[in-house]
Amino acid sequence: MKIALSGKSGCGNTTVSGMIAKHYGLEFINYTFHDIAREHNIPFSEFYEKEIIGRNDYYWDKYLDNRLSVLSRKNNTVLASRLAIWISKSADLKIYLYAKMEVRAERIMTREGGMYSDVLSSTFIRDENDKKRYLAIYNIDIDDYFSETDLVIDVTNINPNEVFELIRDEIDKRNLKKNS
């Protein structure tokens, strides 16, 4: 069984993907720019500004997405990333989590701290930067996810447990099983 889960920052991708992986005994794949920044001992905000936005060659995007593409070929995985539903072509179930920007900013603020207005602004800017980069690199419009997904869940007013239950119901309905 292969599950691919995408959504913008603050939608609960990591949390819900981890819950799915644990419940079904699947490998959880979630390698992000945060991980790369940690590996290089650089604060994420600095890494993002200098290495993601500050470069014109998209090196780190390609590095990250290539690594995720290779990992997505494995069986019995849950891949969580912004582009998971586009990267994991062979996923048995492709899920997109959606939430209003204000709710996502609130969640990010709770997780990372900061002032709401600053987090809201940086969330908007990050969304716009992500959209521009993915269009430039892959010709992917991350706001046009319906054609790539089997299931879209608006998580604006529901918690991770409720999201997990909706996904579990879909997995059970499709009779998806862990491969031996």
From Swiss-Prot:
Keyword ATP-binding appears in the UniProt entry: yes
Transmembrane regions listed in the UniProt entry: none
Keyword presence, Cytoplasm: yes
Keyword annotations from UniProtKB, A to Z: ATP-binding, Cytoplasm, Kinase, Nucleotide-binding, Transferase
Binding positions (ATP): G7, K8, S9, G10, C11, G12, N13, T14, T15
InterPro entries (UniProt xref): Cyt_kin_arch (IPR011892), Cytidylate_kinase_dom (IPR011994), P-loop_NTPase (IPR027417)
Enzyme class per UniProt: transferase
An individual GO BP term: pyrimidine nucleotide metabolic process
E.C. code: 2.7.4.25
GO cellular component: cytoplasm
Locations listed in the record: Cytoplasm
Reactions mediated catalytically: CMP + ATP = CDP + ADP; dCMP + ATP = dCDP + ADP
GO MF term list: ATP binding; CMP kinase activity; dCMP kinase activity
Similarity-based family: Belongs to the cytidylate kinase family. Type 2 subfamily.
Listed name of the protein: Cytidylate kinase 2
Provenance organism: Borreliella burgdorferi (strain ATCC 35210 / DSM 4680 / CIP 102532 / B31) (Borrelia burgdorferi)
Taxonomic lineage from the root: Bacteria, Pseudomonadati, Spirochaetota, Spirochaetia, Spirochaetales
